[in-house]
Structure formats: structure tokens, C-alpha cells
């Protein structure tokens, strides 16, 4: 089978900023240095523009295997495993916890699973917490305790989907309930990423088996054991989550244990326009903005000094995908030419103001042993990150394209950073005779082009 797309790998992650709006009299200290009040208060609401603030939910049904599922249902549905936040840097621990779906092994804790053990290399046993309940959901289910059959149902449901990604759980043979609170995973082969693929990944939030009798794509039917339930959804506007006061978990602060959650409501605000987003941060209509482009940070710090900040390296990376099933992009020389024609270091220095890394994708330094620095890679890889337009022209000539060629490149208008960056990349390509036409697209059309494999020769 021919591959439909291949990455150019123009750049790795830019540094992101998170802004938290406190009251005007709040001390201007970083979040990790803030001292919690001695008596945490219950109630109120949070208005958040998340990392995906420009996008509404794509699907509420796990069987659709959409990449954004856990973002939209993560406050409602829980996982077997999760991160132990007591090991966060903000609490004196070693971990930043800013990586996308990566939890270091020494920071792994049970969420719905109370404990787990390997009976042999192909048999993993998880014992579920007792006293964890699904709340009553009219039209879906009565209140009842989570049990092992729910876990079995969940994995059978997502694995039987026609949209299943077999590479994610292909190593899994079957799942069985040994008793009411014991689940056994039988593997075809051992996979070292078992904790992510079975425990805390994108596609394994636990559902009640009553979902088999309702429309899983209807947001009104979404339910889980988590600290919130979704109570309102208006596409392109807001997703509201209301506290589940029957939630099982707690938080120890000082010497006192508090039931969770503290807040009554969380609103995910969908804000497609960057100017509107920045205005909402300044005026307090947003309590948290999870991603602020660095170009906007200095002005926000000046106009709204009460904002508290944190920063991290974005895990997604910035790259251009190419169709390699048609000429001339099926030619390796052409793809290498496109790569070395772009001055990546100049983009880091000038476009991102130094707040980016040339090589930190698909693995970032915080991924530990997974990460291999560019300096340790083969010379053929290192060459792709050195700006050399003269060699790029020679490669095109060697590929039979001395005069260059034309291509179309698609970009989602939902990503201001890409909209601003792409003309710069196109200008680099023009210097070697590659004439690229930029095609901005709304997200629905952009996603449809990707999933139906009708996308242009390139997209970012």
C-alpha cells in the first residue's frame, strides 16, 4: 500500500504560554510559588480557553476514534490509570506533566484501577476500586457501581469499531472479567507501552455498558464516573461541565482531606478569533487561557499584569505533510530539497523570538529515553536541519526539476500560528523555484480532506 503523506518536518515545538487570571490584588508570583489559602472554598465556575479553544467537539462516541475525544470527555469519563500529580514540579516533584499523553512510569497511579500486576508477560490483571459510581443519567442508566463488565464492554466496543486503529491495541487479544472488580487483559504479544495503550491513552476512557442501548454520538448521553457531567453543549460556543457531587476521589491539602471537585462548573469557551480570545483574557471573561502565542505575551503582561504565567514546549510540533503517492513528491530528492530550503533556525530566532526548538518532535526531551538529540542522529538526518538553498536547487535539478515546480498547500484557518508561518515557508521555497499556492480552509473542510484522503499535495 502506498503512503498518502509524509512529513517534511519543518520545525519542532514552539514554546507555549498559559495565562491564569487572578484578582487584581493577587501577588505577581509564578503558579508554582503561589501559596494556597488555608481554607479551600467550594463553588463558583471556571471559564477556560483550552489548547483547542478554536475547535468544537468532533465526536462524543469513542468508536469514532477521533483524536480530540479525551479532551472533550476527560472531565466526565475516567481512565484505569493516570498521573500522580503529587510528583509535579509545582508540588516539589520532578515532573512538568506538560507532555501529550505521556506519564513517566515513576509517576503512574491508579485511577479506576486500584492496583495491577503481571501474572505472566502476556496476562495483566487490574483490580478496580470499590465505591466508584456512575451517576444516574435520565434515559441512559440508573446510578450504580462501576464493575469489571464495564471495562470489558469499553474495550470490546472501541476495538470492534470499523474506524479502529489496529496499531494502538493490536497486541491485545481479549479482555475478561475474572470477578466483579477484577479485569484481565490477555495479550498476543507484550507491548512496553501497555500503560498508555490500555491505561491512560486517548481511546480507553471507561464507559458504562448501558451505552450499548443509546446513541453514543449524542452529547446528552455522555456519562462516566468522573468529577463532572456535561450539562450544556453549544457548537462553536461553549461546553459546560457541572460538578458530580457523588464523585469518589479526594485531595489532601495540609492535614485536611477534601472531597472533589471544588468548583461547581467549568465552561470550555470556544473562541475562534484570536483578538476575541486576547480581549477575553484582559477583561476577565476567561479565567484560564491554556495557549497564548509568544507574539502576544509581552503586550498581555503589560496591559494585564495580574495574569499569572507558565510556559512549556508544545508537544505537537510544526510540520508539513506531503503526498508521496504522486510525482514529484514521491521523489526522495525533492522532499529533501524542500526541507533544506527552509531556514529553520531563522524561524526559531525571528518568527518565534527564540521561544522554540529546531528539533523536538515527535519526541521531546521530557520523554526521557525516548528522546534522541539531533546531534546523536545520522548525518543524513542532521543535514535536513541545515539551511542550504544551493544544495536544494541541485537536488531538484538531479530529480529532473531544474526550474522547480508548483504545488498547493492547505492550512486550517483555525490555527493563527500556521496562518502566519506558512507565507514565510513559501517565501523560502520560492528561492529554489518551488511555487506554492496557500489554501486556507475552515476546520470541517480541512479535516474532511484529511480523512477522505482528498487533500492537496501538502498541508500544515
Task: Describe every region a protein language model picked out.
Residues 165, 175, 231-242, 269-326, ...:
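Extracellular/periplasmic solute-recognition and catalytic clefts
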Residues 58, 75, 81, 325, ...:
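Periplasmic-binding protein-like
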Residues 228, 357-398, 413-420:
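Structural transition elements
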Residues 47-119, 156, 223:
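N-terminal lobe/hinge region of extracytoplasmic solute-binding protein
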Residues 66, 112-163, 277-280, 328-330:
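Aromatic- and charge-enriched surface segment that lines or borders ligand/interaction sites
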